[in-house]
């Protein structure tokens, strides 16, 4: 599940609004995120060029691009039709408006940095990016570092949007493949379901409480935000099964949306 992490030191340095309060009041939106990110970017070495050595409002790995903004806005590339099959859902005016605004926003490379995983992670724990968008599991990588950070759900598009919606990155999933020539689908399905239920009953809660809340997160507010994150997320068939790689190529989405 993708989410935001924010740097508390930079938040305090630039006297920015409390993001936890914004989330609770339903005011944590794409525009608010961009406003805060813009205030926190800086050319640290004064060479009039923004490079990996400078400070940014938000950093993300280049293989992900702006997808979290899109899903957080409540949009998807595919929807399920009346026959239970996926079909494109790109035709709405809202989709076009969101796409254009996200494209124009993240094209500001003085504020938004896209790069290799290790670069954006280092940028965050060295306190050179206010926001960092990654999968939840990545928060564990910050344990060796002293950076004071908190968790946030993906931003809503507007305050009028009812819920905060999280994006499940299909590249981080481990699907179960069942052979087409399987002669006992019912038995196989029963076993797979049993394993899934056992994982939920015996693994999810201990991981949630012992690892995340007990060792990774650094304040009670992040635990509150985590509850929001894990209780409302979406999958997109186009991302999950690669039905429309021409439009939704994960590795090239950032390049597509900024060109």
Predicted feature locations:
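Short helices/loops that flank or line small-molecule/ion binding pockets
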Residues: 34-39, 117-132
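Glycine-centered hinge/linker elements that transmit conformational signals in sensory
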Residues: 34-39, 68-116
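Periplasmic solute-binding protein
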Residues: 1-21, 59-83, 170-179
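C-terminal capping/gating helix-and-loop segments adjacent to ligand/active sites or protein-protein/ligand interfaces
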Residues: 205-259
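Acidic, glycine-anchored loop motifs typical of Ca2+
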Residues: 20, 43-54
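Extracytoplasmic/periplasmic substrate-recognition and gating elements
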Residues: 143-212
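Beta->alpha turn/N-cap motifs
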Residues: 62, 133-139
